[in-house]
UniProtKB/Swiss-Prot annotation:
Residues 1-26 form the signal peptide. It holds the Pfam family LRR_8. Glycans are attached at residues 82, 372. One of its GO terms (cellular component) is dendritic shaft. The keyword Membrane applies. It comes from Rattus norvegicus (Rat). This is Reticulon-4 receptor.
């Protein structure tokens, strides 16, 4: 009985103390105030058009969400030195005084989301909030992030900026957020990611950039993101990623790149090579160009599929034109550097042109090979061409009726090492080099070269003999 009586006395004492506290600490009329688990002033969905006065100074949590508050004046919560949580989301905020949160040095959570008319926040609004670890600014109609907006928020871990109208991501915006682990930027209109956009985010674990207009990512934009585990870039305007972009992401486990107009040509090789080594979970990377690869997953292509440079001939067009070329519109380099395999098809000075070489048969003006031009030419007409070994038919093919001119061989011309200075004669050297595959001096070119030589070089007697055998030149 004594134990039951003792328990009842304690309960009665607790109720009396709570009533006394409520009397001693007045609560705004539209609010409910309670002390457990933390001292709380709760005024949600009461139709309030302004921040209520008379909020208990001992409040640790203040809930003002779901009202019609349009403005937060300076020092609205200055007396609440112990405040750790402040919810102002889902109101009609169109402005916040730069000194509205002055004195809230212990504030940990600030929710300003779902205030579509806010649009602009003064860069000094969050100064002094050194303990803030969660900040909601999503769905606030923000068009820009002012310089220094997040300065001094060293404890911030969660930053929600999704579903705004952000049109740029300035350098060094998040530089002071060394402890930030989650950054939500999806659902904006960000067109590119500059070099220092994420500078200083050494602790970032999750970065959501999907559903923007991102067409370019600077090669070093992710340089400080060595701890990043989740990266969403789907539903953007990306057609390629530079080779260096993903290299710093040593901890990456989840990657989504789908719903982008990827160009799967030689410029996609760096991304393709990185994806072959990636051991985490990744989405498909469907190709947009060229047409022959449209819809196929870049990850599943062979290296040989990524040759040449595609042209933007498909239905895709980027968001902004500004009279740029297709490559500039797509954010692509203008051409690809040939790799080792590609270089084999590039004609080099001093090398014979292959049958499939694009330069074959092209002669610059004034570079016509020397010769009398009387017979058909079998030599490559390019400046770097050489006489094919089969260009000259054997002399036996030129004999009429089995006649054999005196002094000439009955077999095809034999390759000679060259003429010595002692016996070198013009006719001797030319006859010895015909059909050898070397252009030499360039005089013996074409199937009619030997008759021409006989006419122009031989002594008169030899010329007459050749005339009767071979016919006129």
């Amino acid at each position: 009985m004594k134990r039951a009586s003792s328990g009842g006395s304690r309960l009665l004492a607790w109720v009396l103390w709570l009533q006394a506290w409520r009397v001693a600490t007045p609560c705004p009329g539209a609010c409910v105030c309670y002390n457990e688990p933390k001292v709380t002033t709760s005024c949600p969905q009461q139709g309030l058009q302004a921040v209520p006065t008379g909020i208990p100074a001992s409040s640790q949590r203040i809930f003002l969400h779901g009202n019609r508050i349009s403005y937060v004046p300076a020092a609205s919560f200055q007396s609440c030195r112990n405040l750790t949580i402040l919810w102002l989301h889902s109101n009609a905020l169109a402005g916040i005084d730069a000194a509205a949160f002055t004195g809230l040095t212990l504030l940990e959570q600030l929710d300003l989301s779902d205030n579509a008319q806010l649009r602009v926040v003064d860069p000094t609004t969050f100064r002094g909030l050194g303990h803030l670890h969660t900040l909601h600014l999503d769905r606030c109609g923000l068009q820009e992030l002012g310089p220094g907006l997040f300065r001094g928020l060293a404890a911030l871990q969660y930053l929600y900026l999704q579903d705004n109208n952000l049109q740029a991501l300035p350098d060094n915006t998040f530089r002071d957020l060394g402890n930030l682990t989650h950054l939500f930027l999806h659902g904006n209109r960000i067109p590119s990611v500059p070099e220092h956009a994420f500078r200083g985010l050494h602790s970032l674990d999750r970065l959501l950039l999907h559903q923007n207009h991102v067409a370019r990512v600077h090669p070093h934009a992710f340089r400080d993101l060595g701890r990043l585990m989740t990266l969403y870039l789907f539903a953007n305007n990306l057609s390629m990623l530079p080779a260096e972009v993903l290299v710093p992401l040593r901890s990456l486990q989840y990657l989504r790149l789908n719903d982008n107009p990827w160009v799967c040509d030689c410029r996609a090789r760096p991304l393709w090579a990185w994806l072959q080594k990636f051991r985490g979970s990744s989405s498909e990377v469907p190709c947009n160009l060229p047409q022959r690869l449209a819809g196929r997953d870049l990850k599943r292509l062979a290296a040989s599929d990524l040759e040449g440079c595609a042209v933007a001939s498909g239905p895709f067009r980027p968001f902004q034109t500004n009279q740029l070329t297709d490559e500039e519109l797509l954010g692509l380099p203008k051409c690809c550097q040939p790799d080792a395999a590609d270089k084999a098809s590039v004609l080099e000075p001093g090398r014979p042109a292959s049958a499939g070489n694009a330069l074959k048969g092209r002669v610059p003006p004034g570079d016509t090979p020397p010769g009398n031009g009387s017979g058909p030419r079998h030599i490559n007409d390019s400046p770097f061409g050489t006489l094919p070994g089969s260009a000259e038919p054997p002399l036996t093919a030129l004999r009429p009726g089995g006649s054999e001119p005196p002094g000439l061989p009955t077999t095809g011309p034999r390759r000679r090492p060259g003429c010595s200075r002692k016996n070198r004669t013009r006719s001797h050297c030319r006859l010895g080099q015909a059909g050898s595959g070397s252009s030499g001096t360039g005089d013996a070119e074409g199937s009619g070269a030997l008759p021409a030589l006989a006419c122009s070089l031989a002594p008169l007697g030899l010329a007459l003999v050749l005339w009767t055998v071979l016919g006129p030149c």
